[in-house]
Amino acid sequence: MPKTQRGIYHNLKESKYVASNNDVTFFFSSELYLNKFLDGYQEYRKKFNKKIERVAVTPWNMDMLADITFYSEVEKRGFHAWLKGDNATWREVHVYALRIMTKPSTLDWSRIQKPKLRERRKSMV
């Protein structure tokens, strides 16, 4: 299904609105949602960490978990993500976020062009 006249993709797999942090890639149905995510993820990380600290003080880096939660809140038309160039389910992305909690920092997000199949295969090797 192609994009609508207003530039909205109902099938996220076809979307050209893409954000990546080099490990995880999120697809958005509209440019509005993409910009909303890119403009707000850092502030959301701060809010998310404050919520966690109210319950327990933890040495873990919760940024990726916050980013996944924020993506789910921003993108209303589904969930489509790649993990290191391969399709990933919601659960797989969460497991990845739990694995990297011990890393001291999380990469920042940036807008990218949707990789072509050949480039995607290179990143998987």
Curated annotation (Swiss-Prot):
Site residues by UniProt (Interaction with host RNA polymerase and activation of the phi29 late A3 promoter): 120
GO molecular function: DNA binding; DNA-directed RNA polymerase activity; sigma factor activity
Keyword Repressor: yes
Keywords: Activator, DNA-binding, Early protein, Repressor, Sigma factor, Transcription, Transcription regulation
Ranges of the DNA-binding region feature: 77-96
Pfam families the UniProt entry points to: Phi-29_GP4
Keyword Signal found: no
InterPro entries: Phi-29-like_sf (IPR038246), Phi-29_GP4 (IPR008771)
Oligomeric and partner information: Interacts with host RNA polymerase (via C-terminus). Interacts with DNA; binds to the A2b, A2c and A3 promoters.
Similarity-based family: Belongs to the phi29likevirus late genes activator p4 family.
Its biological purpose: Mediates, together with protein p6, the early to late transcriptional switch by stabilizing the binding of host RNA polymerase (RNAP) to the late A3 promoter. Activates transcription from the late A3 promoter and represses the main early promoters A2b and A2c by modifying the topology of the sequences encompassing early promoters A2c and A2b and late promoter A3 in a hairpin. Binds to a region of the A3 promoter located between nucleotides -50 and -100 relative to the transcription start site, that presents a sequence-directed curvature.
Protein name listed in UniProt: Late genes activator p4
